[in-house]
Design a protein with these regions (language model features):
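Membrane-interface elements of multi-pass transporters and channels
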Residues: 28, 66, 70, 98-106
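Extracytoplasmic catalytic/substrate-binding loops of multi-pass membrane glycan-assembly enzymes
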Residues: 26-38, 48-60, 71
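Transmembrane-helix motifs of polytopic, lipid-linked glycan transferases
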Residues: 12, 78-110
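Transmembrane signal-anchor helices characteristic of membrane glycosylation enzymes that use polyprenol
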Residues: 5-32
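Membrane-embedded glycan-lipid processing machinery
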Residues: 63, 72-82
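Membrane-water interface at transmembrane helix exits
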Residues: 26, 60, 64, 92-100
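Membrane-water interface of alpha-helical transmembrane segments
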Residues: 1-11, 77-80, 114
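Short helix- or helix-capping micro-motifs
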Residues: 116-125
Length: 125
């Protein structure tokens, strides 16, 4: 299997693990600090405290639009968990891209370097 395919598969596996962990530990309702405010402003598409977080509010509204009012908090929290999982995925790919650029010799990467690069991506993400 070539490095590119292995990198993609490993990245999506890391994403799946992160998604499982985030969704299984997610609050079903609100928790402390600003979470309640963000859930409310995302559900009603209102202005939160400065500086706001317009992209978060729009995504939260998109997720909560498909839920009943009782489940709006769970949907906004699941959107936050999925967003965090995608950030883990892109962090993994960023680390492996940098590792690949550092380890490449003559345009080729050997098996040991591939394992080290993917391992560093998993640990770093």
């Amino acid at each position: 299997m070539n490095y590119k395919k292995l990198n993609n598969i490993t990245g999506w596996v890391v994403f799946a693990i992160a998604t499982f962990v985030y969704l299984s530990t997610m609050e079903q309702t609100t928790s402390l600090w600003d979470c309640g405010e963000y859930i409310t402003t995302a559900n009603k598409l209102e202005v939160g405290h400065p500086p706001g977080a317009p992209f978060f509010m729009m995504l939260g509204r998109l997720f909560s639009a498909f839920a009943s009012p009782e489940n709006a908090a769970m949907m906004v929290n699941s959107m936050s968990a999925l967003s965090s999982s995608f950030s883990i995925l892109f962090l993994f790919w960023s680390i492996t891209m940098l590792g690949r650029k550092m380890a490449r010799k003559n345009g080729e990467i050997d098996k040991n370097a591939s394992i080290a690069i993917l391992g560093s991506g998993v640990v770093g993400a």
